[in-house]
């Protein structure tokens, strides 16, 4: 079909520490080096390193009398991962899907589009870290999350 474009990508990642004996210990994990209070993370999966990630995008463009109409949608799947450098189980992120879409019109000078990101309103841990208080007492976890469902209109004028 004229004006129809597909793009697809797959990533497989097997990322592990070969040797990392000075890793951070999460609260409740017994340090392997009691003097330095570090843990041996050798053989563990790296943080923020999902085994699988795949993207699929579809775009359709159609010539109109006054410009070009277009529609685009993107889908991303990411397998489970841990977002904490010490691999704290509280920072485990389950596999998730993200979906976005855009509908618009453009010509050489003007464009307008209606768009939406994270349309399924998926909550994803993007980073995490332990919070400790005096004496190494567990103060809980601090989580950073992705943006919730967002949508809007974008208008452009090119000079």
Task: List the predicted regions and their residue ranges.
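Residue-level preference for alpha-helix termini and adjacent loops
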Residues: 16, 40, 45, 51, ...
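Generic structural signal for short, flexible, solvent-exposed coil/loop and linker residues
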Residues: 35, 43, 85-88, 99, ...
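Residues that define the transmembrane beta-barrel architecture of outer-membrane proteins
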Residues: 50-54, 95-99, 147-151
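Outer-membrane beta-barrel proteins
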Residues: 89-93
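Short, basic/aromatic-rich helical patch in the C-terminal catalytic core of site-specific tyrosine
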Residues: 101-103
């Amino acid at each position: 079909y004229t004006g129809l474009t597909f793009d697809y990508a797959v990533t497989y990642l097997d990322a592990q520490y070969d040797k990392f004996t000075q890793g951070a210990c999460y609260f409740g994990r017994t340090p392997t080096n009691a003097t330095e209070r570090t843990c041996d993370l050798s053989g563990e999966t790296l943080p923020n390193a999902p085994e699988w990630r795949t993207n699929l995008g579809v775009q359709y463009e159609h010539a109109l009398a006054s410009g070009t109409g277009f529609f685009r949608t993107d889908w991303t799947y990411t397998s489970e991962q841990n977002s904490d450098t010490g691999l704290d189980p509280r920072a485990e992120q389950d596999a998730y899907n993200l979906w976005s879409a855009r509908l618009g019109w453009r010509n050489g000078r003007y464009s307008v589009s209606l768009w939406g990101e994270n349309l399924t309103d998926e909550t994803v841990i993007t980073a995490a870290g332990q919070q400790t208080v005096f004496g190494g007492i567990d103060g809980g976890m601090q989580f950073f999350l992705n943006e919730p469902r967002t949508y809007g209109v974008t208008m452009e004028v090119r000079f």
